[in-house]
Each structure stands twice: as structure tokens, then as C-alpha cells.
């Protein structure tokens, strides 16, 4: 009879340990790691092709990957945004000049969310590729920016809508 009582006690202890581990996992998954939070890895790949005369075609691939195990959505109805901007950098800058990513003359702008119908759903582990082509004058330096913004539905400390954002940028030379 003693062996049965010990086995019963061990089984109850293991069951309790499993419940505690499951509770810890659920707490971590939903509280600490932010299961409702979003993350998106954005990369830019560019290619310059000949076009007409001194014009070139800048082909831009905006690649997005949702690395998280849950989906998230961008919705224009909630004032979310997913934009691509191309800016011409000043050719006569002096040494030591720092160009900020959103500095320069705006050449082109594309609303990637609008082009997707106003609603963009990123499934878990999904990878997307949005391609845009822009005609640019040869012998030009441009900065390319892809920016994603999501309204969280809350307000910040100043009473303004709280916005999470993610962006990436690169600089491209358009050769002669």
C-alpha cells in the first residue's frame, strides 16, 4: 500500500508541475513576449536598368516578413500606412554633411497599403514582396525609404494617437 501512495503522490506532483509550467508558458506568451504585438522585418532590394536617354529605371523590391507566430493587419480604415518614398539627395553637399533618411527632394511616393486594396494581412512567418519602378535621371543619388505605421488604438502620454512604426532605408546611385 505504501508504494501506491508514493506513486499517487509523485503523479500529483508531476501534474502540479505541468500546470505550473503551462501557466508560466501562457503568461510569458501573452504578457511578456506580447502575443498581440506585431513585428515586421522590412528589407529593400534595388536594381537600376537603362530606360530612355539619360533616364534610368529604379526597380525597388520592398520585402516584408512577419517573423512572429501570430498574424497582424494594416488597415487604412484605422489610419495605418505602408509607404515607399524616393528622394533625390543634393549633389553639391560638402564633406561631413549628414543626410537624414527623409531629407531631399521627393521624386516619387507610393502608398503600398492603398495598392493592396487598403487592407494588408501578414500571416505568421509570411514573406511579401511589393515591387515598384521609378524613372530617375542618370547620375543621381537617391534615398529610398519604406515605412510602415500601425495605430495601436490607444493614446500616448500627451493624448495623441499611439503609433508603432517600422522602417528601413537605403541610398542608391543611378549611374550614367
Predicted regions and their residues:
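Membrane-aqueous junction of the first/signal-anchor transmembrane helix
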Residues: 1-176
Amino acid at each position: 500500500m505504501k508504494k501506491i501512495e508514493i506513486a499517487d503522490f509523485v503523479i500529483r506532483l508531476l501534474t502540479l508541475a505541468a500546470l505550473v509550467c503551462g501557466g508560466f508558458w501562457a503568461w510569458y506568451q501573452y504578457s511578456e513576449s506580447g502575443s498581440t504585438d506585431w513585428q515586421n522585418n522590412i528589407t529593400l532590394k534595388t536594381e537600376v536598368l537603362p530606360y530612355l536617354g539619360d533616364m534610368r529605371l529604379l526597380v525597388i523590391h520592398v520585402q516584408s516578413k512577419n517573423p512572429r507566430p501570430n498574424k497582424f493587419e494594416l488597415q487604412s480604415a484605422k489610419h495605418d500606412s505602408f509607404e515607399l518614398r524616393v528622394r533625390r539627395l543634393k549633389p553639391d553637399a560638402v564633406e561631413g554633411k549628414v543626410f537624414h533618411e527623409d531629407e531631399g527632394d521627393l521624386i516619387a511616393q507610393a502608398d503600398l497599403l492603398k495598392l493592396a486594396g487598403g487592407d494588408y494581412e501578414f500571416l505568421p512567418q509570411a514573406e511579401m514582396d511589393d515591387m515598384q519602378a521609378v524613372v530617375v535621371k542618370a547620375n543621381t543619388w537617391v534615398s529610398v525609404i519604406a515605412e510602415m505605421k500601425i495605430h495601436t488604438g490607444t493614446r500616448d502620454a500627451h493624448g495623441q494617437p499611439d503609433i508603432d512604426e517600422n522602417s528601413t532605408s537605403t541610398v542608391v546611385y543611378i549611374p550614367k
